[in-house]
Amino acid sequence: MHLFDLPKIDGHCHVLDPVRFPYPPEVPYHPAGQEVGTAAYLAQVMAAYGTKHALLVGPNSGYGTDNRCLLAAIAASPGRFKGIAGVANDTPASYLQELKAQGIVGIAFNYALHGLGHYADNAALMARLAELGMFVQVQFELRS
């Protein structure tokens, strides 16, 4: 069987569409040029490679905790995409439930960008995620 005939899932990709969803000004880095990729562009790339599903990760660079672009991409492709959202430590369970209902399966902790201190007070958030059956994706840098 050829590689293109095998079912494939992209386990981590980003959708960035600053024309439809402008970046919040407080986010320290705004991807541009070749770093930008809309949901429509992602669908074309997935079709070209025979990728059936994807886990979309809301990028901390660009959107921070603004999940509108991520949620729009999931809504436009019912059943094809699931998502990892960015949220604040004090995010209430009701908002996490809303995210889950819209296809979000977990949230991201980006220690590489925010550092350890940013997530120091997250025990209550972790408990709310566990109650909802959601997970945490952790991104970090190895420093020697």
Language model features with spans:
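Active-site gating/metal-coordination segments in enzymes
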Residues: 64-143
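An N-terminally biased module of ancient metal coordination in phosphate/nucleic-acid-related enzymes
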Residues: 1-65, 100
